[in-house]
Structures are given as C-alpha cells and as structure tokens.
C-alpha cells in the first residue's frame, strides 16, 4: 500500500484531528518469557550451552545477558565464550544451583530455603544475579541464629552483604560468651575478630573471656597470626582484668613475653589500673572502659515535669528503683553520662529561671557535687559525650544582654566541658540554631537531628560536628521535619524515634552515619513525644513521653535483629521521665 493511500485511510475525528489509541497488553512480557522457557526446554533457538558438573543447560544468550551483567559482559566483550557455543563452569558451580538461577531467569520465580540460601547467595554474587543475591541475603537475615551467626559473618563479608554482616555481627556480640571458643570463631579473619572485641556492644561482663578468646584465636594458627596479637591485645579492656591476672600474664604468657609491643600495652594497662584506684573514679583510657553490658541504666524524673529524683533500671528484676534525690529540682535540662558520672546541665528551676548550673552525680559514691557552670544559661538543649568531654548543643536562653536571644529563639551556641580541667570552652556554632533536637555522638562526631528553629518551625536537617575541623555541616535531610524526638546509637547506626505530630509520634528510623542513608524500622508500641532513648547490649531502650493527654507508661526495648519492639516493664505512674542515661556499673578493682 502506498503512503498516500495509507494517509487517506487514517482515522480522523470530525474536526480532522488524529484519533489515537494505545494498546498495552499487561501480560505480554509474561507470555513472552513463558514461551521462551518452553523453547528452552524443547531446545528451540538456543545458542549457548552452560555446563556445571556433568550436566548441560541449553539457553538463549539474550535471556542470560538481560538477567546478568556477568553474562552480558561475557557475550559482548570479545571473550572466548562470546564465540563458543559452550560455557563450562566445571565444579565451581553446583548443577542444581545453576538450574535454579536459570529457572528464575526464564520465569522470574525461585524458591529459597535453608538448604539452598547460602549457595544461591554465592552463585548469585558470582554470576551477578543481583536480585537473587539480595533475596538470599534477606532470607538469611530472617533466619539468623546464635548457632549460625559466625558463619554468616564470614559469608556476608566474602560477598559484601553489608546489612547481613551487621545483623550477624550484632548476633555474635549478643552471644559472645557461648561463641568465643567455637571452631567458627577460630575461622574468623583478623578484621572480624577486631570488629567483635573492639565493640562497646560486646555482651560480656567478664573481660577475661575476651582476653582468653584473643589468645585462643592467635594460637589456633600461631605462625600466621602471632604478628596480629598486639593489635588485638590493644582492643581488650585490660584494666578490667583482675590485678593478679594482669601480673601473671606479663610474667607467664609467651605471646606477651616474646613481643615488645605487647609488653608495652600490658605495662600501660597496669599503670591505668593503679590510676583507677588512686583517682577515685576518674577514668578516660579505653583499656578501662566497660562494655555497655556492664552499664547501669538511670532514669531522671519526678512526679511532675519538675525532675527531683534518679531511678535505676533493674534489667533482671524488671523493676525501676528510686536511687537518689536531685539537689536542685529542675525541668527542661539535659543529662549525659561520662564514665561513672552523670552530668545534669542547665534547665529551669521552680521559679522558671534559666540556669547555667552543672550538677554531677557520682554513681560510685552516690553523691552530688557542682562543677564549673556553663558559659550560657540554657534549657531545651541537648548534650552528648565525645572523647571524654561533654558537649551541650543549642537550646534556649533568657539571659538578657549576653546574646541577642530570648526563650523563643533557638541557640546556635555549642559549649565543650573537659572534666579533667573543669573548664568550659565555646566551640563552632551550629549551622542552624535549634532547640528540642536529638543530640548524640557516633563515630567520633556529634549529630543533631531536627529540632525547633529560630522561627519555631520543625527542622528537617541532620547537623554534624567534626571535632578535628571544629566545624558543623549538614549531612542529610530527615525523612520528615522533627522535634521532641529521641536518639540512641549502636555502632555506626543511629536510631531516631518519636515526635510531636500524628505521623512521627510512633515512627522509628535508622540512620547510617557513615553512608548518611535512612531506613524505616518497625513502629514503636505507642506514640511518644519528648521520649528518651539509649542503647545497651545491642538493643535500644525508650522510656517516657506522651501524646495528647496520654502518658506512655512502659519501658520498651527494640531488637534490631528481629526489627521488633516489646515492653520490658511499666514505669511507676508517679514517675515522669525527663532524661535517660547509661553509666558504668563500677570501676574494676
């Protein structure tokens, strides 16, 4: 038919405009794929044969290349296989696993179970079937147990499955007491052992177990691993070991006797041990820092929003026990723990005056003292410990004539307190002044999430402070504008929960401070505004808060490995939590 005749036969409306209809058969791609699968099984138009073991699999190059970058590169880059009619994997790939991958390529379906998940992960990674690798990872994440977590660490590290590695690591940290002398532990790489023993989240109350596990791992392959010993030894909290064991190890342990670096590390630990006993609780050295499993959880609160008492959380008895009275009741303060001490900064007293005061509670001697006052009186601020110093961030002030601020203006000013010198120093200001922000430290940096701006708006920024540069920067945007939220830290993961809107009050998110990526996690059991959170023993705890007229009366726990929340115990009805901190239980004797 000529073009002219075709043009004359085009359908036109009465106005002369084109009348066009788009036909889209939704099932077309499925029909094509199903027919290709039928032709594969009948060996019609197949142009390549894959071999695994002693089995052959006729296929279509185009289908393989469309599903796998591995095959796309193989068939298009002039490799020998692009010309040959066969690709032989020999024994590097199990025939049944290759068959599953090909069935997926031609049907978009695959059954993953406990028997094939690891093999599919390995094969999916090798042949760049990324969907299969990710699906196998997700399956293994949901089937992670103490009995297989060490093996999953090794597998996920080999195939760069970051999420599976992190979950496996957390499970190992939680069960280290039963895993440290297993064959799988001895199969870990040096870097994996370092990830475990250097973590504050390692759930072990007797540091001797960690010390012995390092010796056991090194001696399992002494010739290859003895050079790693000093690096590993430095991550053991040696000053937490009994004095007699420290002395005995220096004299009797061959690995220490034979290495000058190890001797020096042990000598430093002995000196630190002596300083601990002499300095009555002032400890800054890593070798004396207890793991978080050796921490005590303390709630600061009162019968009203005016806080007047400290309470201790008893994990085992699931009780909240009154501990000590505050010497000066206050509200809208911030509290932060450094070692065995709790620092209560600022706030407003009974007459609503804004305070510069800093009260310090010594959990060892159970007594209060005053430290040097802050440079600016403030309330509604945040505080966090960073490299054994205390930082206070943002908030409000009502001190006229010092800074052009009022209770309605959010501060940019940041102060740093050094417990060793008992002095405060002004640091670089926030990029944007905020109050009621969630402030935490992670990976040697400070983070401030959301808050209330100088215009009284909710803030959606993540502000980050780098102490090396003494500078704040904007790292990311929050999933939504936030204020009156809580934050807790597990390694490089920061967990944010709660807020003052219907949409944020029950929500919870995970922020990776190394990649600046957000992930939505399971919602809390209740809506919470002005709640308080901390991390201990690879779990996140949240307490307090309210929404509308409803007060939250439970202490809840979030388990990252199962992405689930549950209530631990009820908070006494008369207690309104104002702060939540974690301190060292004791100094090692």
Swiss-Prot record:
PROSITE patterns: BTB. It comes from Xenopus tropicalis (Western clawed frog). Substrate-specific adapter of a BCR (BTB-CUL3-RBX1) E3 ubiquitin ligase complex involved in various processes, such as translation homeostasis and lipid synthesis. The BCR(KLHL25) ubiquitin ligase complex acts by mediating ubiquitination of hypophosphorylated eif4ebp1 (4E-BP1): ubiquitination and subsequent degradation of hypophosphorylated EIF4EBP1 (4E-BP1) probably serves as a homeostatic mechanism to maintain translation and prevent eIF4E inhibition when eIF4E levels are low. One of its GO terms (biological process) is regulation of translational initiation. Residues 149-250 form the BACK domain. Residues 46-114 form the BTB domain. One of its GO terms (cellular component) is Cul3-RING ubiquitin ligase complex. Pathway: Protein modification; protein ubiquitination. It comes from the Eukaryota. This is Kelch-like protein 25. The gene is klhl25. Component of the BCR(KLHL25) E3 ubiquitin ligase complex, at least composed of cul3, klhl25 and rbx1. InterPro entries: BACK, BTB-kelch_protein, BTB/POZ_dom, Kelch-typ_b-propeller, Kelch_1, SKP1/BTB/POZ_sf.
